[in-house]
C-alpha cells in the first residue's frame, strides 16, 4: 500500500511549482519559506522594482471552497506582519520599498494555476 505524501512534502512540491510558474512570468526568485515568530512567507520574489510576497495555496478539489478562499483575514494579517519583519530584517524601508502580496492558487494537481496579483491590500 502506497502512503500519501505528508502535508509538508506536498506543500514544498506546490511551492516549487508556483516558483517555476512565476519565473516563467519574469519574476526573480529571492527566498522560500521565510519563518519568523509572526508567521511564514511561502515565496519572496521580485517583479522589476517590487518585492512580491507570495502565498501558495493548493486544493485537490473545490468542494469546500477554492484555494484562494483559504487566505483568511487572519492569515492576511500574519502575512503582512511577516513581510514587514522581512523588509526590516533586510534593511529595507517600508515607506520607500515597493512591495505587494500575491496568491498563487493551485487546483487539480497543478493543471489549474491562478495567479492573483495584489490579492492582499496592505493596511
From Swiss-Prot:
Q: Which CDD domains match?
A: PoNe_Nuclease (cd20736)
Q: Which Pfam families match?
A: UPF0102 (PF02021)
Signal sequence range? none
What superkingdom does the record give? Answer: Bacteria
Instruction: Tell me the GO molecular function terms.
Output: nucleic acid binding
Which regions span the lipid bilayer?
none
Entry's family note: Belongs to the UPF0102 family.
UniProt protein name = UPF0102 protein VSAL_I2655
**Provenance organism:** Aliivibrio salmonicida (strain LFI1238)
Amino acid at each position: 500500500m502506497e502512503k500519501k505524501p505528508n502535508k509538508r512534502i506536498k506543500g514544498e512540491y506546490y511551492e516549487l511549482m508556483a516558483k517555476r510558474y512565476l519565473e516563467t512570468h519574469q519574476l526573480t526568485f529571492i527566498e522560500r519559506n521565510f519563518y519568523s515568530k509572526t508567521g511564514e512567507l511561502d515565496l519572496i520574489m521580485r517583479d522589476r522594482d517590487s518585492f512580491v510576497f507570495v502565498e501558495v495555496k493548493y486544493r485537490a478539489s473545490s468542494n469546500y471552497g477554492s484555494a484562494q478562499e483559504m487566505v483568511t483575514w487572519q492569515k492576511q494579517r500574519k502575512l503582512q506582519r511577516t513581510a514587514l519583519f522581512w523588509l526590516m530584517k533586510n534593511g529595507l524601508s517600508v515607506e520607500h520599498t515597493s512591495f505587494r502580496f500575491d496568491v498563487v492558487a493551485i487546483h487539480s494537481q497543478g493543471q489549474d494555476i491562478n495567479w492573483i496579483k495584489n490579492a492582499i491590500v496592505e493596511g
